[in-house]
């Protein structure tokens, strides 16, 4: 028998326990985070939309969006301020056509974990235009500054898609097991 295309039920149930307020129906198992990024770019951006990303960053989702013909806007992080977000530049970058604000947290390549005020600024920017926050969280759990893993964006705003995998924090890149966490209609669209 072939497995379920959205992931085996018991696996989706286990992943759901990592995200408060989710069920297996909020989880889509993917071939690594790479497939999750590809699915999100294809399903969540509409003609005329743009995507906002922070730099430096892991470029896969923005590359997917660009390859599909979408405008990718960049907000440079402030290196002299420990890679903090430029919240003023973020406010200028978003508009009513911003479909996605992409966040890699902890950041790749800087390792920067967003402060609560930076997280709040991302949420406020997304809420101001109805954008989805797509949070690449594959490095959550690799932190060395604290015993607490970086908090997920999931549950902080109603339009969040969290992406994770077994590659980084779990040290199993060859397994090619990733997932996305999202509202059920998004899971169905992906």
Predicted regions and their residues:
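N-terminal small-domain helix-loop-helix segment of the aminotransferase-like
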Residues: 1-35, 39, 89
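Hydrophobic residues in well-ordered beta-strands that form the structural core
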Residues: 53, 74, 102, 133-135, ...
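A short helix->loop->beta-strand "cap" motif at the edges of active sites that frequently abuts
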Residues: 49, 70, 128-131, 158
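Active-site phosphate-binding strand-loop segment of PLP-dependent enzymes
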Residues: 79-148
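Short strand-turn motif at the edge of the Rossmann-like AdoMet-binding core
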Residues: 56, 137-139, 166
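Conserved PLP-anchoring active-site segment centered on the Schiff-base-forming lysine
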Residues: 43-65
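Conserved core segment of the aminotransferase class I/II
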Residues: 156-190
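Short acidic capping loops at alpha-helix termini that bridge into adjacent secondary structure
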Residues: 23-27, 47-50, 97, 158-159
